[in-house]
């Protein structure tokens, strides 16, 4: 938090250290206040204590500006992709439930090979579900279930387009790996059970508390109507 000062309190040489009034007021007000303080700091004859206090204030304001810009970007990106994430979460939940049911049925057979394979599938589905929820809200969402037609439309003979596809696939694999490690180390900020119960979860990204979209974490409808598995395939 930036240092607070009493309203209207003036410093020597007319320097004002009021910053509380701009907190929460948006990026424009923060930028203006930062410029004002930086202009003040350019003055040669500025008392040492005033300079120190203003330097601290401008540092705090820059952090606040970064937070504000981060949250604004996160909201814009989340809004753009919230429907894709919503349907992908529902699909991931459905696939996990199917995998759990399959494991339960296979476990009754005592066939170790089949049980091992079923457990592996459950783990895969858990990673997918956590991926959808944990994917940073400030990034363009990379779908787990991309439409094959979209990939077919990409001109692979175009080096730029081909590189874009490769980078997208690399990011998808890298983030799935991160999620897998979080699950293995029991470091997910929620449990898979909570998600299956429809509970809302909040995720931290880079020190920011970014709440998962309500649509993504909303409880599933009570009707049991099955959606086609190829909705996003």
From Swiss-Prot:
One of its GO terms (biological process) is maturation of SSU-rRNA from tricistronic rRNA transcript (SSU-rRNA, 5.8S rRNA, LSU-rRNA). Signal peptide: none annotated. It is found in: Nucleus, Nucleolus. Its main location: nucleus. GO terms for cellular component: nucleolus; preribosome, small subunit precursor. Keywords: Coiled coil, Nucleus, rRNA processing. Residues 150-169, 210-233 are annotated as: Disordered. Residues 53-130, 160-188 form a coiled coil. Belongs to the EFG1 family. Involved in rRNA processing. PANTHER family: RRNA-PROCESSING PROTEIN EFG1. This is rRNA-processing protein EFG1. It comes from Scheffersomyces stipitis (strain ATCC 58785 / CBS 6054 / NBRC 10063 / NRRL Y-11545) (Yeast). The gene is EFG1.
């Amino acid at each position: 938090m930036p240092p607070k000062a009493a309203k209207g309190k003036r410093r020597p040489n007319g320097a004002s250290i009021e910053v509380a009034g701009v907190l929460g007021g948006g990026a424009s007000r923060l930028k203006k206040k930062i410029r004002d303080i930086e202009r003040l700091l350019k003055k040669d004859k500025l008392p040492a204590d005033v300079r120190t206090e203003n330097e601290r204030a401008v540092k705090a304001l820059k952090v606040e500006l970064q937070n504000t810009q981060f949250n604004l970007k996160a909201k814009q990106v989340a809004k753009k992709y919230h429907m894709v994430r919503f349907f992908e979460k529902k699909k991931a939940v459905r696939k996990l439930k199917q995998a759990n049911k399959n494991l339960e049925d296979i476990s009754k057979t005592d066939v170790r090979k089949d049980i091992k394979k079923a457990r592996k599938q459950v783990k895969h589905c858990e990673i997918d579900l956590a991926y959808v929820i944990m994917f940073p809200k400030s990034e363009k969402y990379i779908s787990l279930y991309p439409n094959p037609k979209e990939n077919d439309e990409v001109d692979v003979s175009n080096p730029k387009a081909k590189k874009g596809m490769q980078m997208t696939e690399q990011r998808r694999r890298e983030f799935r790996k991160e999620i897998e490690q979080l699950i293995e180390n029991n470091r997910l900020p929620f449990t898979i059970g909570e998600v299956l119960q429809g509970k809302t979860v909040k995720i931290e990204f880079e020190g920011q508390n970014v709440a998962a979209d309500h649509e993504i974490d909303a409880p599933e409808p009570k009707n049991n109507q099955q959606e086609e598995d190829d909705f996003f395939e």
